[in-house]
């Protein structure tokens, strides 16, 4: 799938030391939302910071999920393991890497 215009939600969370596994279990939603096309999780080398990147079909689909009870429950489950959280919502595109 080509992403000429993507809607991208990026969250960064600093975790309490030693809580990565518990956080990972809490982070996974009980159901994946309609409109989410892709999702990635990236951890720092020490496991104390996680970046979540999700690609959405529209700004509206992301907003529906953000305001949903599924997301509210997920956030409540993650809260005991999170020290700090930052988030941003962006539009972007996939860059083509030239063949070598």
Predicted regions and their residues:
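Short S/T/G/P-rich N-terminal loop/turn motif that feeds into the first structured element of a domain
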Residues: 1-100
């Amino acid at each position: 799938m080509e992403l000429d215009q993507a809607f991208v939600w990026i969250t960064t969370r600093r975790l309490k030391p030693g809580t990565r596994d518990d956080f990972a279990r809490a982070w996974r939603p009980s159901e994946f939302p309609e409109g989410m096309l892709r999702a990635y999780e990236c951890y720092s080398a020490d496991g104390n910071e996680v970046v979540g990147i999700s690609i959405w079909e529209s700004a509206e689909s992301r907003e529906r999920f953000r305001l949903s009870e599924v997301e509210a429950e997920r956030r409540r489950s993650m809260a005991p393991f999170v020290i700090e959280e930052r988030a941003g919502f962006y539009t972007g595109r996939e860059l083509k890497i030239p063949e070598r």
